[in-house]
């Protein structure tokens, strides 16, 4: 399971022109589910993301996590993250989870986040328009 996290001052996702989720300070989490992923991996990744120290303390060092700054998360499914890009000029998607499994684990991950802090979501498998202001920019690839 892969999370591409971006520290944002604001982020929003729209489906068919309607806002389905938006946050101010926090993390935009683009979530990719791989074939071998399960609930244990989803929980481990959620714990890692929510405790990953990407926010600055009073000394300007990245020592605080999203929970410590009372931030929010916006979770957006991103089936392209597990793509195989090693050869050619077209990505392969055989490493991605089956859509039914991917949706179940996306929902599970998002539900776990909701238990910890303010969480907004995109809509699984929808054509989404994601807007954000990346603060930094600060972006990290986390994988379990």
From Swiss-Prot:
Keywords: Cytoplasm, Hydrolase, RNA-binding, tRNA-binding. CDD domains: Dtyr_deacylase (cd00563). Disulfide bonds: none annotated. It is found in: Cytoplasm. InterPro entries: Daa-tRNA_deacyls_DTD (IPR003732), DTD-like_sf (IPR023509). A motif (Gly-cisPro motif, important for rejection of L-amino acids) lies at residues 136-137. It is an enzyme of class 3 (hydrolase). It catalyses: glycyl-tRNA(Ala) + H2O = tRNA(Ala) + glycine + H(+); a D-aminoacyl-tRNA + H2O = a tRNA + a D-alpha-amino acid + H(+). Pfam families: Tyr_Deacylase. GO terms for cellular component: cytoplasm. Its EC number is 3.1.1.96. An aminoacyl-tRNA editing enzyme that deacylates mischarged D-aminoacyl-tRNAs. Also deacylates mischarged glycyl-tRNA(Ala), protecting cells against glycine mischarging by AlaRS. Acts via tRNA-based rather than protein-based catalysis; rejects L-amino acids rather than detecting D-amino acids in the active site. By recycling D-aminoacyl-tRNA to D-amino acids and free tRNA molecules, this enzyme counteracts the toxicity associated with the formation of D-aminoacyl-tRNA entities in vivo and helps enforce protein L-homochirality. Belongs to the DTD family. NCBIfam families: D-aminoacyl-tRNA deacylase (TIGR00256). Homodimer. A Gly-cisPro motif from one monomer fits into the active site of the other monomer to allow specific chiral rejection of L-amino acids. HAMAP family: Deacylase_Dtd. This is D-aminoacyl-tRNA deacylase. It comes from Aliivibrio fischeri (strain ATCC 700601 / ES114). The lineage of its organism: Bacteria, Pseudomonadati, Pseudomonadota, Gammaproteobacteria, Vibrionales.
């Amino acid at each position: 399971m892969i999370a591409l996290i971006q520290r944002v001052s604001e982020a929003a996702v729209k489906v068919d022109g309607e806002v389905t989720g938006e946050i101010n300070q926090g993390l935009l989490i683009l979530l990719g589910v791989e074939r071998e992923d399960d609930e244990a991996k989803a929980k481990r990744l959620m714990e890692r993301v929510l405790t990953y120290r990407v926010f600055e303390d009073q000394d300007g060092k990245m020592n605080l996590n999203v929970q410590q700054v009372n931030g929010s998360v916006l979770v957006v499914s991103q089936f392209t993250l597990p793509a195989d890009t090693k050869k050619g000029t077209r990505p392969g998607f055989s490493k991605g989870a089956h859509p039914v499994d991917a949706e179940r684990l996306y929902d599970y991950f998002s539900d776990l986040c909701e238990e910890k802090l303010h969480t907004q979501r995109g809509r699984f498998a929808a054509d989404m328009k994601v807007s954000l202001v990346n603060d930094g920019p600060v972006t990290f690839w986390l994988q379990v």
